[in-house]
Amino acid sequence: MSRPILEVSGLTMRFGGLLAVNGVNLKVEEKQVVSMIGPNGAGKTTVFNCLTGFYQPTGGLIRLDGEEIQGLPGHKIARKGVVRTFQNVRLFKEMTAVENLLVAQHRHLNTNFLAGLFKTPAFRRSEREAMEYAAHWLEEVNLTEFANRSAGTLAYGQQRRLEIARCMMTRPRILMLDEPAAGLNPKETDDLKALIAKLRSEHNVTVLLIEHDMKLVMSISDHIVVINQGAPLADGTPEQIRDNPDVIKAYLGEA
């Protein structure tokens, strides 16, 4: 059996006297779609914040391809190929759609100050390649015709897709999506489902998803992890989770 691309053991996060995350375990295989579900306030986003370096976990291990990454700052984790979206759209609203993508591409540009100042052939070539890659991802998320529109003027579902495209500009190995279907209508949710499937099948991306839309979760996930009150409650296939009495109780309460 191959080693998981991401493995989390005993993840713990305290805020003073509050134990927000308590002993969460997670294994993600390459090219899987793994969903993390649970009632509001269960600690799911806190887990994401620990995995991506926004929080420094109090305890536990986070391994990416066997390398421990807990405690690393967010930008170093991103450079290792782990990127994320947030519950709230975080685009540069005054910039165009294509400019939002180019911002995410800066680390891959073969440029420096002098090259930019003198517009060297290497700089121009790097700039051209960045534009071509941005155009590619605008096409992948069906936003080509909106390339020069300000991001803030796009429909909400379009902004969500643009956020995912911006993540993909960094060539990630793991894409973490925090409630990407929140606020979407059924057609937009179907488009999101198709996009996630495409990222996995055509771009070899592993997806870790927080989502409350159970229809989407059950239809797209290979594996589901359930968290309740900061602690692991259950994990398994969609079929196993659907019929788990502890999961049903956590969502619906006891009769």
From Swiss-Prot:
SUPFAM superfamilies associated with the record: P-loop containing nucleoside triphosphate hydrolases (SSF52540)
UniProt topology in membrane: Peripheral membrane protein
GO terms of molecular function: ATP binding; ATP hydrolysis activity; L-isoleucine transmembrane transporter activity; L-phenylalanine transmembrane transporter activity; L-valine transmembrane transporter activity
Domain ABC transporter per the UniProt entry, residue ranges: 6-254
The entry's keywords: Amino-acid transport, ATP-binding, Cell inner membrane, Cell membrane, Membrane, Nucleotide-binding, Transport
Pfam families: ABC_tran (PF00005), BCA_ABC_TP_C (PF12399)
Record-level GO cellular component terms: plasma membrane
Predominant localisation class: membrane
Binding site for ATP: G38, P39, N40, G41, A42, G43, K44, T45
Subcellular location: Cell inner membrane
Any single biological process term in GO: D-alanine transmembrane transport
InterPro entries on file: AAA+_ATPase, ABC_AA/LPS_Transport, ABC_transporter-like_ATP-bd, ABC_transporter-like_CS, BCA_ABC_TP_C, P-loop_NTPase
Function, as annotated: Component of the high affinity leucine, isoleucine, valine, transport system (LIV-I), which is operative without Na(+) and is specific for alanine and threonine, in addition to branched-chain amino acids.
Family: Belongs to the ABC transporter superfamily.
Protein name: High-affinity branched-chain amino acid transport ATP-binding protein BraF
Organism, as annotated: Pseudomonas aeruginosa (strain ATCC 15692 / DSM 22644 / CIP 104116 / JCM 14847 / LMG 12228 / 1C / PRS 101 / PAO1)
